[in-house]
Amino acid sequence: GNALISNNEALDETYKHLNDLASGARQAIPTGYCDLDRALNGGLRNGGLYYLAARPGGGKTQMSLQIMDNAAKQGIRVLYISLEMTETELTERRLCVTGGLTLNQLEHPDADAWKKIASASQALYDRPIQFNRISRMSVALIERLARQSKAELIIIDYLGLIQHGQGKSIYEKVTATSNNLKIT
């Protein structure tokens, strides 16, 4: 994009933004977590870059999947980029939550579990979600996929695995990647 904007362009963009606010256009994507939405003034803002941090096994992927499903349920186009799990593994987690199943019940279903799987599949069907199938990602590839998918919400799980030539430590890699994502 252009690094400079004129005064008139800034005024025009601000006027359009205020007009959108007045007309009730969606200003935030609700996460589905009431306390988080309240803290974020209604949810995730357009152009925002948000981080979900916790120790390994802290539920980051599950929470991001629930945010994704909540947004998609409202018709928001979502691109979910996982650099650790396949779309099948992610969908299994979603089926477990939606169907009230354990992973063991999902992998070894009895007749009742099959009914829950079918019901959960139906509930999740037709949501505007796309998953990546490439395990090695760069910021440039994420940008291309975002344009291709016309996503309104992009979730990346997780930043530390994005390929980046700069930096040696995980902190340096995440910082460099975050800076590049925020600019784009």
What are the roles of these predicted feature ranges?
Residues 38, 62, 70-150, 164:
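Cytosolic-facing regulatory segments adjacent to core modules
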Residues 161:
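Residues immediately C-terminal
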Residues 51, 153-155:
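Structural motif
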